[in-house]
Structure formats: structure tokens, C-alpha cells
Amino acid sequence: FALNPWFLDIDNLIEENFIFISNPEELGPTKQNKSHFDFDDADNLTKKLGHLLLQCWSSQVEERKLAFNEWISKNSWIEDYALFVVIKGEFNMLPWWEWPREFKIKNKKFLKSWIKEKSDKILIEKLIQWHLDEQWRAIKKFANKYNVKLIGDLPFYVSRDSADVWSNKSLFSILKNGDLIFQSGVPPDYFSSKGQLWGTPTYFWSKHKSTNFD
């Protein structure tokens, strides 16, 4: 469900007064004239935007806060996603199966006080995803207006190191410690004489069926 924070439209955030910047250089230097994408630049910029969104959030009009809260209530996935991103950042982006045990198994009792302690960071991730969703919907509306069709691509399986797998282990062929029971791939074919091993957990369809594929 989540979108990549690198797609945030900074101009839109400024125009709509979600962030206040008197000088674009406040966001820091970015490397120009490069023939490749600079991931470090993108990460640093996203972090700065997140902090700006948080700083300006308390001064936003009540209507916007209500819209945000309504979006949160309709997108339950955001709770686990935001928590996952913040925990991952705390442990130097290690995969979740290398986190300390209580984080790895998602011990709710243990995490309760930790979530309160990191509430600002968690709010930042929620705000980023809310803005991304709003901006995406605006693009989709614009495309519809001019009869432009958008095509998306979905993977067969879910990444092992993802919020979805970490928070819903029982739905995948994976143990609580992160070890794979079964993993996806394809046998040898025209494209690969040795076949392919993708490293993503397969689905426990019986578990999905019991939840009505919710």
C-alpha cells in the first residue's frame, strides 16, 4: 500500500503551506548534473521534508487534521508500516529478522511504551504517506480528465523484509524468527537454464482464506 517517499512533490507541499521554506537551500545541497540517481541525496531530502512536515503540523487548520485522521481510520495498514519503518531506521536498516527479539516477533506489550517514545517519528511516516496518497490521487484525477490510462505492475510475491510480512507472519511461509519455510521461484525455462530462486516467502492460502482474504 505504501508509496516511495522519494516521489513526494516538494513544490506541492510548499504551495499548499504544509511546509514553510523561505530559502530552498534550507533543504541542503543536492548533487546536480549526475548521470545516475543519488540514493543518499534522496534519503537525506526525505528526512528533512519529514521533519518540516512535523514542525508545521501543529499549526495546520483543523480541517486538514480531520482529513488526516479520517485517512488514518480508512487505512489500517499505515500503523504497522509506520512502526516498521521507524524500527528499521533505529537498527541501521537491518532486515527485521536481525532485530532484537522483542522487535522481531512484534511483542505488542513490549512495543507499547516504545511506540509512545517514538510517536513523533511514527507520525512523520504517516504524514508522508498521507501526502503521497493525496498527490497520487490528484495525478490520477488529472489523468482521467484527459483520458490518460495508467498501468501498474504488481509483483507475484511480497518482499521478505517488508512491513506486510513482519506484521502478518502467519499469512506467509515464514517462521517468527524470519527463517523461510518455503520460498518462491521458477524452474528452468527458456529464460533461465538454471531456474530462478526469488527468496520471497510463499503464501499460506489456507490462512488467507480463513481471513476472507482481507
Kindly give the residue locations of the regions a language model identified.
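Alpha-amylase-like alpha-glycosidases and glucanotransferases acting on alpha-linked glucans and related
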Residues: F1-D133, V158-D214
